[in-house]
Amino acid sequence: MLKSPIIGISCGDTNGVGSEILIKSINRILDLDVLIVFFGSMKLLTFYDKNNEHLLRFNLISNISDIKKNKINVFNCLEDDFKINPGEITPYSGNAAYSSLDCATNFALEGKIDILITMPLCKSNVKQPFVGHTEYLRDKCGVSQNLMLL
C-alpha cells in the first residue's frame, strides 16, 4: 500500500486570494488521498472561512508527525498579531508571503513534504532579491534551470 503524499501549501499574500482559494476548495481537496499542510496561520484561515463552515476541518500542528488525514493541517509560521486587509498591499503581507514560502520550501528540502503548492503573492510587495516563486525556488534549491507547472 502506498502512503498518501504530503502536500505543502504556502499561504501567499495574506491580503490576497490564496487563503480564500484554499477555503473554497477544501471539500474537493479533502476528497483526495493526500495529506495537506498549510503554511500560514489559523487566524488567516478562520478569517477567510467567513461562516466557520470548515473550522472543524483545521488541525493546528507544531510537528509534521501531528498531521491528520481529512484535515487542513496548519503549521503556524506567521505572527498572530497581524491585520488582514483584503486587497491591500502592506509590508506585513509581503513579509508573511515570503516567510510562508521559505518555511514550506525548507520542509520540502528536508523531505517533510512531498509536493509544494505556492499561493499567489504580490511580487512588488515581497522585498527579497528574487522576481517570483520560480526564481526563489531555483536559487533556494541551488539549480541553474527551472520549470513552472500551472
Label for each model-derived stretch:
Residues M1-L150:
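Anion-binding alpha/beta catalytic cores of soluble intermediary-metabolism enzymes, centered on
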